[in-house]
């Protein structure tokens, strides 16, 4: 996220009386603290090596919301073209197999720039 997006998030959270910790960080270097977050949201950033740290960073009962492009996105005009940054069928669910799956979807949805092939997961860390 950009610094501007983080500031907007903080302003909205303040107006709603919510406690939000929004961080601008390079995820190549940032170390997620263990059992800290009630909610982790990840959209269109795929770094497979973060799966374990994400699970450990969730508090017991914490939620993960994750969406990323799949290899089927290659047929559309935008999104990553490097297959290393695209999920394979069933991969997202497998990456977070230690969590309780609440919702899982793989397919094509309408995005703001046209169709996009995604895998989506909402999962919960067991108490």
Question: In which residue ranges do the predicted regions lie?
Answer:
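Conserved SAM-binding loop
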Residues: 9-10
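Acceptor-substrate binding/catalytic loop of class I
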Residues: 75-91, 111-113
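Conserved beta-strand signature within the Rossmann-like core of class I S-adenosyl-L-methionine
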Residues: 61-73
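A short, conserved alpha-helix within the catalytic core of class I
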Residues: 45-59
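Core SAM-dependent methyltransferase catalytic element
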Residues: 107-127
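Conserved SAM/SAH-binding beta-strand->alpha-helix loop
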Residues: 2-4
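A short acidic, Gly/Pro-enriched loop at the edge of an enzyme's catalytic core
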Residues: 28-39
């Amino acid at each position: 996220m950009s610094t501007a997006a983080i500031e907007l998030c903080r302003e909205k959270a303040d107006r709603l009386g919510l406690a939000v910790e929004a961080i601008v960080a390079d995820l190549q270097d940032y170390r997620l603290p263990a059992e800290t977050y009630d909610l982790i949201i990840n959209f269109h950033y795929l770094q497979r090596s973060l799966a374990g740290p994400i699970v450990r960073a969730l508090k017991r009962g914490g939620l993960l919301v994750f969406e990323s492009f799949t290899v089927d996105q290659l047929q559309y005009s935008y999104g990553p073209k490097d297959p290393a940054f695209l999920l394979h069928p069933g991969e997202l669910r497998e990456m977070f197999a230690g969590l309780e799956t609440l919702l899982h979807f793989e397919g094509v949805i309408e995005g703001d720039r046209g169709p996009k092939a995604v895998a989506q997961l909402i999962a919960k860390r067991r108490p």
